[in-house]
Amino acid sequence: ASFSIEGIPFVFTNSAMGCLVDVDVDTGLTKIEKFWAVEDCGTQINPKLVEEQIRGGVVQGIGGALYEECIYDEMGNLTNGNMADYLVPMAYEMPDIIVDHVTTNSGRSILGAKGAGEAGTGGAPGAIMNAINDALISLNTEVTSQPITPEKVLKALGKI
């Protein structure tokens, strides 16, 4: 027997994400208090694995939104190319990530399954930026680029 993917498109997950943040306007630090992720992965072959895959995608998205950035000097050399200088989210910084599911089986995959987890890498940064800007709206400011570092928040507030 043989199998070919020709004519069978990739089937991606759909999701909705949101979070509650606390922005310290004195330090610029953002703490994610709670995060919600609802994904439609179609048929879940291993539901526990899917839950943790979604959480992993959200954590990766948190890293992109708040921490991860390649910094180069004027000669083009990477200046933060080690784990001491390249920031990633740590376990103690992780919020409670609440995962839920909407299930619509895909008619384009044999088992009705779709992707699982990748939505967090794209959805989480948007949800985080929206939550931070919502927290700052009464101060008539916003941040417009990621990662959303304390320095960027303080600059948006006119404090540095």
List PLM regions with ranges.
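Cofactor-binding beta-sheet edge motifs in enzyme active sites
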Residues: 1-160
